[in-house]
Amino acid sequence: MTYSFTITNIKSSVKLKPSIEFDFVVQRCHELGASCKRFRNLLSIHYKKKSFVLFKGCKRVPNSGQHLNITGCRSTNKTLQAIEDFNRLIGRPTGSVNYRIDNYSCTSQIDHRIDLESFYMSNSNLRVVYNRENFPGLFLWSPKKPKLCATIYHTKKVNIVGSNNLEEIEDFFNWIKDVTVIN
């Protein structure tokens, strides 16, 4: 399916089993030139232009593994490559890995101008917030999917986040185009 928007980021997650010690990961990052910052319960790693957040495993639930978040990918192929890169970083064999897409960030243009403040003032029935700051933007949430949100700018640019389903994003974007047209 062809979408009328561009994917700017995919946030994915992976369950790593067995768990891996933070000290070992920090050492491997140092050896391979990856940027790694340690926090109490997580490691923030930047490697090969991707960001990884590795969380500590749960000690109360043995063999539960660890949670890894991945960002900085614009396609599922890039996500799979990032997972392979991370596995190489920690010295694990690459192969098939189950991952989940948690969120897409997308951008597009609408083909008509919107008076953001007027739209905000005349649509109290919608979940909408108008930000009047230096770079004005209108935050508009989907009436069908409460986590799905668009930021609409006076430049006609639209950023959409809050779904792991591209068809939901496409439907929301088409709804935005319809609801913002002045009759």
Name these PLM-found stretches.
Residues 1-151, 155-159, 163-183:
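Intrinsically disordered, low-complexity polar/charged tails and linkers
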